[in-house]
From Swiss-Prot:
It comes from the Eukaryota. The keyword Transferase applies. It comes from Dictyostelium discoideum (Social amoeba). S-adenosyl-L-methionine binds at G179, D202, G224, D225, F226, K239. The lineage of its organism: Eukaryota, Amoebozoa, Evosea, Eumycetozoa, Dictyostelia. Belongs to the class I-like SAM-binding methyltransferase superfamily. Cation-independent O-methyltransferase family. COMT subfamily. GO terms for molecular function: O-methyltransferase activity; S-adenosylmethionine-dependent methyltransferase activity. Its EC number is 2.1.1.-. This is Probable inactive O-methyltransferase 11.
Amino acid sequence: MECSESLELVDKFACGHILSRMFNVVMKHSICDLLEDGPKHYSEISKIIGFKDDSYCYRLMRYFVPRKLFKESVVQVGVFSKTPFSTEFSNNGTLKKLAKFHCNSFHYKLSQVLPETLEIGENQGPSSIGLSDYWEQIEKNEIYKNEFNDGMIGYTTHILKFLKGKIDLSKFETVVDIGGSHGYLIGSLLDRYPNVNGINFDTDMVINSSNEKYQHPRLKHVAGDFFKSVPEADCYLMKLILRCFSDEKCCELLKIISKSMKSNAKIIILDIILDSSKYLNFDTYLDILMMETLDGKQRSLSEWIKLFEMSGFKIDKYESGSPNYLIISKE
């Protein structure tokens, strides 16, 4: 291995904290959007975003050139242009809100006690910064709550592109999106199925505080506690919900849903299926994030099967790809 290649390994495995912080600045100032209408000199970018010293902006932009986020002109040094990557993180792409959420400062603070969490075998994240749990951050920090909501919208927008043709809701009368936040997922799906009615079901705090609730004539926003009861329906959606909880809590939730399910009802779970033959970086990252924020976890297919068997369900269909999903029904 060449010397330069060896040092690239150091960057890849030891310097991620710098990457996260640098990218946070890029997203905070929407720099990817600034390049969408054409190349710009770093001094112009610096002026737009309000840096006091242009040279610091140059070093920020240059840092991301070998990472293929930006391109620097070889003819006009200091002039930067967009790449396919940067477009994805602009308003013309689908990843801006999701990326901005994941690189925020709160997540960075939680990561500082990851070694303790791993060594002790118990979540140390929220308590390390004086929180009783992760949800307290959403309740008390308006900025983070908005970034959380935006992040969920961003993820939903991204997967909606790939869901078409994967799942079919046409045979159902009522579909409930459990933990649906703003209702963007179920609301968007209703546009595809004119005979389906939708219910967006989430906590009172979420339902009555979201400024971006999806409006649709066949969609109701209902507040409640899904660990107590859920609305009756013949189909339920759960997007990235079960990963937030332990197996025991997931069993509890599934059994509560079971009580309200109509005959032949289905539950559609949009969540990661970890595959040891093709682990993806983002999937394993999310597993660690769940561990550090909620004591949750991502699951392999065998873990999903075990969870469903414990809860009185069976898998009717699943796909491990993009996106991952499982369709289950009562045994």
